[in-house]
Amino acid sequence: MNLLARIFGRKPSNPDDWLEPAELAALLKSKTPPVIVDVRGPGEFSGPVGHIASARNIPLNQFPNHIAKLVAEPRDLVLVCHSDLRSAAAAKLLRRAGRTKVAVLRGGMMGWRT
């Protein structure tokens, strides 16, 4: 386990839980694109790095208030943050609540922008 994972208490996830930026780009062009949830704060979401056009902004500190609605969402969910640490934490919360179709954008917005 790497240093950041130990610091944040996050164990490596199943490789199927991660979505590469190119895979997300293709899914966004499909007939049934996933719901993108950006867990960064409003300042980051609207800041210079920007956000994915269709993303919903639900900051991680407000995430618990939205779990029931997100668990019930019929489409697949993709979570994103600046790198991928906060989105991985949010995915863990959703999985604990029973949500199975949830992925984390590998590298977050930094991966998306490269």
Name what the model sees in each region.
Residues 51-53, 98:
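Short, structured coil segments at secondary-structure junctions
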Residues 32-36, 53-54, 76-77:
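Short active-site oxyanion
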Residues 47-50, 91-93:
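Short amphipathic alpha-helical segments
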Residues 43, 64, 85:
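Glycine-rich nucleotide phosphate-binding loop and flanking beta-alpha elements
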Residues 18, 36, 55-57, 102-104:
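Conserved beta-strand scaffold positions in the cores of enzyme catalytic domains, especially
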